[in-house]
């Protein structure tokens, strides 16, 4: 397959603060995720030319703000997509945290707005609101939060949030504020997105479904006089051949049992997130029909919440599938793979030359006598570049 010409997009990687390993659904091949390992991934993503990294949020994860503030000084260009949590935070406190971190890391902060879609976890955090009430809180939160970051004094008495003489004394580096990313597939979520955020995110659904969602969100935003950009969250399993990539996908779930799938799907079923419901419907908890669209594999979603699909294939095939998403309006790809350190290298080395992200071109390669030609032969000869396997 010939790699298509692709418009430039942003590609972000992922810091696995909830765990990492070679396989899903088992401790076999598991890996300690400590500060040193997270720093390794961040530095690799920085040097490889990724635009940024997403840090997950929730009780199964290390706190994203603490991790970002610890890791960011070890990188130079990498941006950090960190979550604010309406309903769990005061918008004024969140604004101070945002401005402080943005200043400390030189304007490299991106903000992920997470409303929360698991009622059980929400109650554990003290939030007892219904689905639509949480989006009411999100709207009020973002209005106050954005105004504070933009330098305004805020006085508001809303249904859920009341602020008197709210001010931010020390502004962020980015003006008027760091970009806001947000995902919400329900009517309430789309309504909030159209009014308040900069980039709308979707899970990795088939291109036709993504196109439908993008068109719907774009139309609602245009009715409000606003224009949004769009991103997608996906896993990637890329190898030098399609056969090797599909073998790697099968191997990723080699230890996943039917009991493990049933237990995971039971947890997902209790959630009131429309996006999670759409993810679960793609595979129905069955492992016999996991290729839900050409080269889009739903095996991850058998046991993992949130992002449950992966692009699987050789570099040219994966680049072609990325182009399909670009053609329907996606300009940002938030990616991950298991294990995250190795797969960050694999995707960048195999696919970046085909998709040519602008941000990767800003990286000055480190000079080393072992690259990029590979290991010397017999301590004397350099490998012939013409014989090298080309991505």
Swiss-Prot record:
Swiss-Prot/TrEMBL catalytic activity: an alkanesulfonate + FMNH2 + O2 = an aldehyde + FMN + sulfite + H2O + 2 H(+)
InterPro entries assigned: Alkanesulphonate_mOase_FMN-dep, Luciferase-like_dom, Luciferase-like_sf, SsuD_RutA_monooxygenase
Keywords of this entry: Flavoprotein, FMN, Monooxygenase, Oxidoreductase
One matching Pfam family: Bac_luciferase
Enzyme class: oxidoreductase
Entry EC no(s): 1.14.14.5
One GO process term, biological-process aspect: alkanesulfonate catabolic process
GO MF: alkanesulfonate monooxygenase activity
Domain of life where this protein originates: Bacteria
Family: Belongs to the SsuD family.
Protein role: Catalyzes the desulfonation of aliphatic sulfonates.
Classification via NCBIfam families: alk_sulf_monoox, PRK00719.1
Protein name listed in UniProt: Alkanesulfonate monooxygenase
UniProt source species: Rhodopseudomonas palustris (strain ATCC BAA-98 / CGA009)
Organism placement in taxonomy: Bacteria, Pseudomonadati, Pseudomonadota, Alphaproteobacteria, Hyphomicrobiales
């Amino acid at each position: 397959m010939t790699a298509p010409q692709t418009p430039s997009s942003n590609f972000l990687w992922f810091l696995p603060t909830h765990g990492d390993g070679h396989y899903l659904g088992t401790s076999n091949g598991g890996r300690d995720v400590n500060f040193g390992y997270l720093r390794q991934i961040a530095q690799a993503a920085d040097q490889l030319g990724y635009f940024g990294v997403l840090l997950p949020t929730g009780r199964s994860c290390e706190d994203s703000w603490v991790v970002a503030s610890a890791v960011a000084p070890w990188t130079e260009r990498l941006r950090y997509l960190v979550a604010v949590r309406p309903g769990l935070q005061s918008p004024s406190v969140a604004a101070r945290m945002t401005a402080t971190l943005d200043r400390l890391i030189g304007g490299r902060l991106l903000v992920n707005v997470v409303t929360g879609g698991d009622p059980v976890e929400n109650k554990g955090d003290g939030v007892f609101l219904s689905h639509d009430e949480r989006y009411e809180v999100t709207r009020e939160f973002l209005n106050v939060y954005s105004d504070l970051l933009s330098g305004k004094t805020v006085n508001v008495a809303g249904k859920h949030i009341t602020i008197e003489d709210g001010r931010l004394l020390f502004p962020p580096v980015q003006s008027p504020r760091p970009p806001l990313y947000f995902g919400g597939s329900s009517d309430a979520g789309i309504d909030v997105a159209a009014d308040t955020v900069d980039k709308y995110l979707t899970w990795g659904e088939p291109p036709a479904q993504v196109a439908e969602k993008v068109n719907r969100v774009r139309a609602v935003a245009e009715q409000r006089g606003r224009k949004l950009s769009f991103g997608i969250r996906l896993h990637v399993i890329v190898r030098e051949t399609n056969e090797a990539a599909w073998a790697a996908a099968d191997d990723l779930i080699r230890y996943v049992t039917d009991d493990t799938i049933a237990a995971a799907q039971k947890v997902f079923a209790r959630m009131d997130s429309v996006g999670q419901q759409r993810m679960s419907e793609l595979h129905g908890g069955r492992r016999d029909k996991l290729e839900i669209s050409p080269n889009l594999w739903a095996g991850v979603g058998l046991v993992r919440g949130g992002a449950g699909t992966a692009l699987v294939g050789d570099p040219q095939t994966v680049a072609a599938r990325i182009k399909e998403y670009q053609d329907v309006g996606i300009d940002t790809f938030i990616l991950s793979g298991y294990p995250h350190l190795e797969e960050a290298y694999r995707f960048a080395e195999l696919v970046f030359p085909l998709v040519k992200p602008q941000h990767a071109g800003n990286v000055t390669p480190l000079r080393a006598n072992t690259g990029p030609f590979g290991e010397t032969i017999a301590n004397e000869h350099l490998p012939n570049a013409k014989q090298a396997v080309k991505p």
